[in-house]
Amino acid sequence: MKTILCAILLLLTSTANASTMLLWSCKLLDGHTIDDVKAINSAWVDYVNELTDYRAQSYVLEAIASDDMTSFRYIDVFENPIHWGQIRSKMEAGDFDKFEAQFNNATQCDAASLYEAEES
């Protein structure tokens, strides 16, 4: 029994500093600026953080030197896979449609990857 409890405790502490990160690769559409994207994204994060007890963070990575200055990235950081799943379920239910329309009007995102990140 002590061995099982010790193993569970080690598992919990090893994931305590882990986050789930979603990385989007996007481009600005004509007539829109990175400031437009940042405003939409800020409102999106505020809404996400109203929905659960977990806290999300989001970053807009703006190119400072690139062969395509319309390209940028989003990094959305969720506390864990459960948090990401809760938000994803709400997206599937249409709770984020107003933001999706705004993002689609200003950006084209062709790729997304989901990562588990741990501090090292």
Q: What feature does the model see in each segment?
A:
Residues 10, 14-94, 105-120:
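Short S/T/G/P-rich N-terminal loop/turn motif that feeds into the first structured element of a domain
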